Amino acid sequence: MRNDGLRIEGLTIATLGAHPLMLVEGVGLEVRRGRILALVGASGSGKSLTCAGALDVLPAGVRRLSGRVLLDGEEQALAGLKGRHVASIMQNPRSAFNPVRTMRAHGVETLKALGRHDRRSEAVLLQALEGVGLEDPGRVLGLHAFEMSGGMLQRMMIALALLTEAPFLFADEPTTDLDLVVQARVLSLLEGVVAERGLGLLIVTHDMGVVARLADDVAVMAQGRIVESGPVGEIFHRPRHDATRALVAAHLSLYGLEGVA
């Protein structure tokens, strides 16, 4: 067993109440530094809940029954994982920002939470925005979310996530509601971040095009369980589970094997 990454073991999540419904059951994943793991599955398969459960940020009405996270072989408290060890980019960037606060205010808030807010904060924020390809970062820092496009907001979310300097990044459907050109730019940005910083990236998606474009390894979810996992080429060329075959067949019918290793 490798000990140089982030491992999620035995994660089980259920609804509250006398008769709980299992939503995620016995999920195990491994995210390695410098590699991209795609967690893929149909809507409702448990992908986003898996991310939320691993980071101890589950929504109301559900609870984690079991599961642990190991970093380089050592168990970590889930409550302390987010921010220090794992940065996150969640769905729908527009809803992630307070509409009455500027991007500068959000950036300062992030730096304060990290204990890094000082007289150099403005320069740090400008550099962070430049690093994700936001043009005229000084102007962008003065904008509110409603003044920005979806692509700009997604880049801003990535910039704030990278301020944490965490070795792992969870990205939950980062290209949802973006047009194809902006999607490609965001994926290129994430790919570059992994290559340049050696981050381990877990990307949650239902889009096999994103998987083909970005992933090194793939884990397929169906009905709250991991039903298949392996290198991206193996998943596309030799899918074993019915859920995987359905996802691959739908993608191949539209795009063929273009871009798949």
Swiss-Prot record:
Gene3D superfamilies hit by this protein: P-loop containing nucleotide triphosphate hydrolases
Domain ABC transporter: 6-248
Broad class of enzyme this protein falls into: translocase
Reaction catalysed by this enzyme: Ni(2+)(out) + ATP + H2O = Ni(2+)(in) + ADP + phosphate + H(+)
EC identifiers of the protein: 7.2.2.11
Matching InterPro entries: AAA+_ATPase, ABC_Ni/Peptide_Import, ABC_transporter-like_ATP-bd, ABC_transporter-like_CS, P-loop_NTPase
Role description: Part of the ABC transporter complex NikABCDE involved in nickel import. Responsible for energy coupling to the transport system.
Entry's family note: Belongs to the ABC transporter superfamily. Nickel importer (TC 3.A.1.5.3) family.
Protein name: Nickel import ATP-binding protein NikD
Underlying gene: nikD
